[in-house]
Amino acid sequence: MVIAINCRHLTPNKLEGFGTYTYELVTRWIKEHNEVNFVLIFDREPTVVIPELPNVKKVIIGPPTRHPLLYWIWFEWSIPRILKRYKATLFFSPDGYNSLRSRVPSVITVHDLNFEHNPADLPKVLGWYLRKFVPKFVEKATRVLTVSAYSKQDITKCYRCASEKISTVYNGANEIYQPLSEDVKITTRKRISNNRPYFLFVGSLHPRKNVQRLITAYQGINNPSVDLVIVGSAMWRDHQISVDPNGADRIHFLGYLAQKELAEVMGSALALTYVPYFEGFGIPLVEAMRCGIPILAANTTCLPEIAGNAAIYCDPFNVQEIQTGLEQLIENDTLRIQLSENSINRATEFSWDQAAKQSWEVIYTTANT
C-alpha cells in the first residue's frame, strides 16, 4: 500500500492550523504503520523535522503554492505526476484541496467553510478559487474528514454531500500544554506583562478571529487590572487592527511563538479569550483546557461543541457582551476556579493520538475498498 500525502503546509515557523494538523497525524502514521509506504509531497524544501524511516519517501515538486493559479498547477499537474510515478493507492490532502485530474482515490479534510459564509474575509482571488473548487474537491473525494459536528453539518448542507461520506474526527493538542507551577507563571508574566495577570488570544490575525472586537471590548474596561496578550501573525496585509493609544501599553502583540514558549504563555494566562465569529474547531481551546485555564468563547459555530463547560460564552458581534465576559473573569474568582476544573476534565476528550487513530481508520478502509 502506498499513501501519498500533501505536506505543503509543513513549513518553518508556520506550524499552526493546517501545518499542525498535518504534522500531528503524519508523524504518528509513519511510525505506527511501517507496513505502509508513505510518499510525503512538498512544494519546496522542507525544514520541519520528519523522522527518516525506510517506509517514507519525501518528494519536492514545484511550483511553490503562493497563488491560486499555482495551487491549480500544483494539484492538477504536479500531484497527478507524483501519484502515477509512485503508484499511489490513495492520496490524502489535509487542507481540503484535491486533484480533479487524478484517478487515484482520495481522502481530504475540510476544516470549515468560512469562505462560503464570509467571502469578504479573504482576498478576492483566493475566495473565488475556494468557492469554485472546494465543492468540486468534496465531490471528487472518496471520503471526507472534518473536525467538528458543526463542520460536518455545514458541508452536508452547503454541498449536498451525503453525511455517510463525511467522518468527524476531533483535533487534539500538543502534550506540552500542562498546568504550570506558580514560579513558572510569575517568571512568564514578568517577561511579557510586567508581572500583571493577562488575558490571552492565540491564532492567526485573520478577520474571522475577531481580534478587533476583542481589543475594543478590552479597551472598554475602566482601568483594567489585567493586560491583553495577542499571539499570532497577520494573514493578509490589508487586514489592519487598530488600538486606542489610551491604554495601548497594556496590550502586547507577541507575533508567532514556538510551542514551548506558547505553552508557558498559555499556562500563565488568567484566561483564554477566543471569540471568532466563525470556526471549524479551535485548537487553542484544547490547549487552554490542557493547561487548566478558564475560557471566554464565542457562542457561534463549533465553539460551544468543543469548549463545553470549560467556557463562558458571548455574542462575537456584540462588543458589550465580550466586555462583560472579560469583566466576569476579572471579578469572579469562584467562576474562574470552576472553569479551570472543568477545563482539566474536558481536555481528556481530545488527543492527537486518538485523532490519528480515527483518521487512519478512514484512510485504511478507503484504500482497501
What are these regions (language model features)?
Residues 1-369:
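Carbohydrate transferase catalytic cores enriched for Leloir-type hexosyltransferases
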